[in-house]
């Protein structure tokens, strides 16, 4: 069910209440868009790691996934590692939430270590050969572009990583040229 309440109004409602795990959990159980959004805004950060997998598995729409990634998932302990795990699940909204979480982490200035970067590149390569949804593919490519734009040398490492595995470039050359300017 979607009542069409605007995001700013939902945030205003949430701002009037203290963060509360029990209330957030109860709101999440209702299959109503506005309740799920309020649940995301009201869940205390220290409990976000406990509910992450469960809430992702129950998420059906990208709007909810976007807010879940932005407001909760990118704040859990070891968020980059968890995001890479979700990407590898390859079912439901897990890959989408994983890429969105990575995108928010990159925007906040985190840097992937060598192992994380390798896993990220592997996921991008696998995506070009998969049957994932267009929405997940677009999200993954946008995350890849954001990573390249914010991580010096990553474009070269991505090219090296993919040259022997995939004859098609993971991120088309015309997009990479735009990031170099």
Where are these regions (language model features)?
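Alpha-helical scaffold domains
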Residues: 1-181
């Amino acid at each position: 069910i979607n009542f069409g309440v605007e995001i700013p109004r939902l945030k205003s409602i949430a701002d009037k209440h203290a963060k509360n795990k029990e209330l957030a959990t109860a709101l999440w159980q209702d299959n109503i868009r506005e309740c799920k959004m309020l649940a995301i805004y009201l869940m205390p950060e220290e409990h976000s790691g406990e509910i992450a997998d469960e809430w992702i598995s129950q998420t059906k729409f990208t709007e909810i996934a976007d807010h879940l990634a932005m407001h909760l998932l990118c704040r859990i302990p070891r968020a980059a590692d968890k995001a890479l795990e979700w990407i590898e699940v390859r079912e439901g909204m897990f890959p989408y939430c994983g890429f969105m979480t990575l995108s928010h982490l990159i925007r906040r200035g985190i840097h992937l270590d060598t192992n994380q970067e390798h896993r990220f590149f592997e996921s991008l390569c696998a995506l070009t050969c998969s049957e994932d949804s267009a929405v997940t593919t677009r999200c993954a490519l946008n995350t890849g572009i954001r990573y390249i734009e914010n991580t010096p040398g990553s474009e070269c490492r991505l090219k090296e990583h993919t040259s022997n595995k995939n004859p098609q470039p993971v991120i088309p050359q015309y997009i990479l040229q735009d990031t170099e300017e």
